[in-house]
């Protein structure tokens, strides 16, 4: 077997809830693991692969909390088994059928630790002793034999390789949301990957002298040890066709080790079948007998489980017409499937100047059966009209017959604004046989092998502090857990059926039939919060009533109010947004008096006044409703990935006109697509004729989560001197007006002390406020800056901040670094913690506000909870740029 995996970093995870436990005797197991000697024909490649697998197993199991005696097993026949408390039980207390939470499954990466590997059991786990266990091979063989475990380990070459196991019911709950099947509610976590070691089934059968096909040896049947009620009492059993069982390319083994350890009780100790590329239901656990026969297994479970019937066949019809015994409906090989794991269910993506700087990385898994390679994975944001091809991380090599047994991981970088305009995200995969996933769910009575497009719905939300965000919703949640868009829509359907008025409103969308025409000059007058009109493709829309609900905030509309914004709207909005826009159409643009936006607009700060009768007022460059062209004057490399860019304003005597705390959009066409990113200038707002930007360049191929790097930052870095970029603004909901006063969403706030927490490039709006305060000698506002970065080289504007802190007592600056700490570093190491904040920022008080800008995880997991511990009301006293 030539399967192999490559190095992959594994992230930590949240521990499950540890419950109190009782003491029960452990199952008797040998003191020493049955580690076979290296094969005589082993190669250095095999040794290297084994070392890689060992490393992967160790990394994947790091941080897994000890299994416990779960109180839910009290009083059951499984009360002697320790289990991981995080596993989601799907069939109540007993029998134990469980899957891990999907985020937990993915956090461990390619190899799934045994304690969180999904479990499928039909009854109680048999008690087993290694020393006493035998596997009988009988039936149509010349040498029937009972093998002990020691014989299986020592008398046969061992085979070890990674393989993905999938329950045929994976994603069944989606089917149950449409119509209840006869199966329980698997989520998308009924899949796991482990490194398995065992004895080749082919070698075992040949050792026992399997008869020829001509002598009737057509099927190889497997029987487990558990006593089950099905069929009036039986063991779990199933079978393979002879050709499959003897096929050397299929790597079928009797496995006795999982991830370098003996099998656990839930996974078949001491020995089980592993049939790569087949559904888990064919892999008999607690294996006791192998019978070569002229007919397939006669087990009740072979016939009454793991079948895929046509959609019209329900359980009653299947029983009446004996569909269970029709061989064409048996499920053997796994089908093609893929799932979105990031974004996770109920994950919130804030929309702000930080999150729009970099694309969002979507992730998930994909697999196929029969050894077929997953050749591509695609994601759509527009219901399948267009598809984007994902990057696929394939961590195994094929075996010598070219077969793949493991899942792969896919990722795709998506612009945040594209997600904002999407109604849903869907994924599909393809394999080398050109199999792909159907768009729509195909219901069947057992709820088996559901593999329709995995869809994640997007909804606009308003997280804390009134920000706009996107909340993601998976179709279902496993077991009896509530949640998921399918459950919500099902409930809405029930409500509409019971309420004729609601049903009519749901099924009869509003149709706007306005045909009135407006002149451009009339549209231009509607350019404020009280009346915000826009022009898109010659149509006039009144967006006033949508201001408060717009996902990007009202400023995004007000920037364009009174103008023709066709280009910008088309660049960043999806088909969903375009359809929504129709509800706000009030008429058409008259073409008879059309002139260009700039020809008749008055951009002067004096408006239509006679300027000769007014005191001199310096011209402001920014116009919220227009892009202004700005030429690149200079470019200075501060470090290997940080640039100081100076841009000229359109006129030498202009100031930028950017309120302190606001930002601007830089607009450029990159690869024939409009790209817009938010930046906060570091130059003083009263500089005349220019503005400065400090830009961190995210290069391609440097950050594993963003292999393509930053589109805009790389574009800016590549610009030659003299190039022109378009700038639009101002934009932002926080404005510092001086001497402790703020306007937040237009409402006044005041503070004598400011707690200022920044991460990475999020320092720029903090820096802007600090700069404004220090320029005013009468502004006595106290500032306490805590600035977190990964390494010292990542700290932006450190010289300026340190110099200001030396000169001004009202500014305190403290740094936190995560890695590459030099000797003599005098600041904090690690992450922003409660103790760091207690030492370096003021406690909460009525005249203290907190300001923050940085990566969303920093704000969510470090800033917000630790400020709360200091007494801050993060709903009201934390301002997020």
Swiss-Prot record:
Region (Disordered): 1-46
Ranges of residues in domain Cytochrome b5 heme-binding: 515-590
Cofactor: FAD; heme; Mo-molybdopterin
InterPro entries associated with the record: Cbr1-like_FAD-bd_dom, Cyt_B5-like_heme/steroid-bd, Cyt_B5-like_heme/steroid_sf, Cyt_B5_heme-BS, FAD-bd_FR_type, Flavoprot_Pyr_Nucl_cyt_Rdtase, FNR_nucleotide-bd, Ig_E-set
Catalytic activity: nitrite + NAD(+) + H2O = nitrate + NADH + H(+)
Binding site for heme: 550, 573
Origin superkingdom: Eukaryota
Pfam families documented for this protein: Cyt-b5 (PF00173), FAD_binding_6 (PF00970), Mo-co_dimer (PF03404), NAD_binding_1 (PF00175), Oxidored_molyb (PF00174)
Record keywords: Disulfide bond, FAD, Flavoprotein, Heme, Iron, Metal-binding, Molybdenum, NAD, Nitrate assimilation, Oxidoreductase
Cofactor details (free text): Binds 1 FAD. Binds 1 heme group. The heme group is called cytochrome b-557.
Binding locations of FAD: 677-680, 694-699, 706, 711-713, 764
GO BP term, pick one: nitrate assimilation
GO terms assigned for molecular function: FAD binding; heme binding; molybdenum ion binding; molybdopterin cofactor binding; nitrate reductase (NADH) activity; nitrate reductase (NADPH) activity; sulfite oxidase activity
Domain (FAD-binding FR-type): residue spans on this chain: 625-737
Enzyme class: oxidoreductase
Keyword Metal-binding part of the UniProt annotation: yes
Biological role stated in the UniProt entry: Nitrate reductase is a key enzyme involved in the first step of nitrate assimilation in plants, fungi and bacteria.
Subunit text: Homodimer.
UniProt record similarity statement: Belongs to the nitrate reductase family.
UniProt name for this protein: Nitrate reductase [NADH] 1
UniProt organism field: Phaseolus vulgaris
């Amino acid at each position: 077997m030539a399967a192999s995996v490559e190095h992959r970093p594994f992230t930590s995870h949240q521990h499950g809830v540890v419950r109190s436990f009782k003491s029960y005797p452990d199952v008797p197991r040998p003191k020493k693991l049955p580690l076979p000697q290296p094969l005589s024909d082993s190669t250095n490649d095999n040794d290297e692969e084994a070392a890689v697998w060992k490393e992967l197993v160790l990394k994947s199991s790091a941080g897994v909390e000890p299994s416990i005696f779960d109180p839910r097993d009290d009083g059951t026949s499984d009360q002697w088994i320790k289990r991981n408390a995080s596993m989601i039980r799907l069939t109540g207390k007993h029998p134990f059928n469980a899957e891990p939470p999907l985020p937990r499954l993915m956090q461990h990466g390619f190899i799934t630790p045994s304690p969180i590997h999904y479990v499928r059991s039909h009854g109680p786990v048999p008690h087993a002793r290694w020393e006493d266990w035998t596997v009988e091979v009988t039936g149509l063989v010349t040498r029937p034999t009972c093998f002990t475990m020691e014989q299986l380990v020592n008398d046969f070459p061992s085979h070890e390789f990674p393989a993905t196991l999938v329950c045929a019911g994976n994603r069944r709950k989606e089917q149950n949301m449409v119509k209840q099947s006869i199966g329980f509610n698997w989520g998308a976590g009924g899949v796991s990957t482990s490194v398995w070691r065992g004895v080749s089934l082919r070698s075992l059968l040949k050792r026992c002298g399997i008869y020829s096909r001509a002598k009737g040896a057509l099927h190889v049947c497997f029987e487990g040890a558990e006593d089950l009620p099905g069929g009036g009492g039986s063991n779990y059993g199933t079978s393979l066709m002879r050709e499959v069982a003897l096929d050397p390319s299929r790597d079928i083994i009797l496995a006795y080790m999982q991830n370098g350890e003996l099998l656990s009780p839930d996974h078949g100790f001491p020995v089980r079948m592993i049939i790569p590329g087949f559904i888990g239901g064919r892999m008999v656990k607690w294996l006791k007998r192998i019978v070569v026969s002229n007919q397939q297994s006669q087990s009740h479970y072979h016939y009454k489980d793991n079948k895929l019937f046509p959609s019209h066949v329900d359980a009653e019809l299947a029983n009446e017409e004996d569909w269970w015994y029709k061989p064409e409906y048996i499920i053997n090989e796994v089908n093609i499937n893929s799932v979105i794991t990031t974004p996770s269910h109920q994950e919130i993506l804030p929309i702000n100047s930080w999150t729009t700087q970099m694309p969002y990385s979507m992730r998930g898994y994909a697999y196929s059966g029969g050894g077929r390679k997953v050749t591509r994975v695609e994601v759509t944001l527009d219901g399948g009209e267009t598809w984007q091809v994902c990057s696929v991380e394939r961590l195994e090599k094929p075996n010598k017959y070219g077969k793949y047994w493991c899942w792969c991981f896919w990722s795709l970088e998506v612009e945040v604004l594209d997600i904002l305009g999407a109604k849903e995200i869907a994924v599909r995969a393809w394999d080398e046989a050109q199999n792909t996933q159907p768009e729509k769910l195909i219901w069947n009575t057992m709820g088996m092998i559901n593999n329709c497009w995995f869809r994640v719905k997007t909804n606009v939300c308003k997280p804390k502090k009134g920000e706009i965000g996107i909340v993601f919703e998976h179709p279902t949640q496993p077991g009896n857990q509530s949640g998921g868009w399918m459950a919500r829509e099902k409930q809405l359907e029930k409500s509409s059926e019971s309420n004729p008025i609601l049903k009519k409103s749901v099924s009869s969308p509003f149709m706007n039939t306005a045909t009135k025409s407006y002149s451009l000059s009339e549209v231009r007058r509607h350019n404020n919060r009280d009346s915000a009109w826009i022009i898109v493709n010659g149509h006039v829309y009144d967006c006033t009533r949508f201001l408060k609900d717009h996902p990007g905030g009202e400023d995004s509309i007000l920037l364009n109010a009174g103008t023709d914004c066709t280009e910008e709207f088309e660049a960043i909005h999806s088909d969903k947004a375009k359809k929504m826009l129709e509800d706000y159409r009030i008429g058409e643009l008259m073409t008879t008096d059309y002139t260009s936006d700039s020809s008749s607009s008055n951009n002067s700060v004096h408006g239509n006044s006679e300027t000769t009768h007014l005191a001199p007022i310096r011209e402001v460059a920014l116009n919220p409703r227009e892009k202004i062209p700005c030429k690149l004057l200079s470019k200075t490399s501060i470090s290997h990935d940080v640039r100081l860019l100076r841009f000229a304003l359109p006129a030498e005597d202009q100031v930028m006109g950017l309120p302190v705390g606001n930002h601007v959009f830089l607009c450029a066409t990159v690869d024939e697509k409009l790209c817009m990113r938010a930046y906060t200038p570091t130059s003083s707002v009263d500089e005349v004729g220019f503005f400065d930007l400090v830009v961190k360049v995210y290069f391609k191929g440097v950050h594993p989560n963003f292999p393509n790097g930053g589109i805009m930052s790389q574009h800016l870095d590549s610009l030659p001197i003299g190039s022109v970029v378009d700038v639009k603004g101002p934009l932002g909901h926080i404005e510092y007006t001086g001497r402790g006063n703020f306007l937040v969403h237009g409402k006044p706030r005041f503070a004598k002390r400011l707690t200022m927490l920044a991460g990475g490039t999020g320092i720029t709006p903090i820096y802007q406020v600090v700069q404004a305060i220090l320029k005013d000698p009468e502004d006595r506002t106290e500032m306490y800056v805590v600035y977190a970065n990964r390494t010292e080289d990542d700290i932006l504007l450190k010289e300026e901040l340190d110099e200001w802190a030396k000169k001004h007592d009202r500014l305190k600056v403290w740094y936190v670094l995560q890695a590459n700490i030099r000797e003599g570093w005098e600041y904090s190491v690690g992450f922003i913690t409660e103790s760091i904040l207690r030492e370096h920022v003021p406690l909460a008080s009525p005249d203290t506000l907190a300001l923050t800008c940085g990566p969303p995880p920093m704000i969510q997991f470090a800033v917000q909870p630790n400020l709360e511990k200091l007494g801050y009301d993060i709903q009201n006293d934390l301002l997020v740029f």
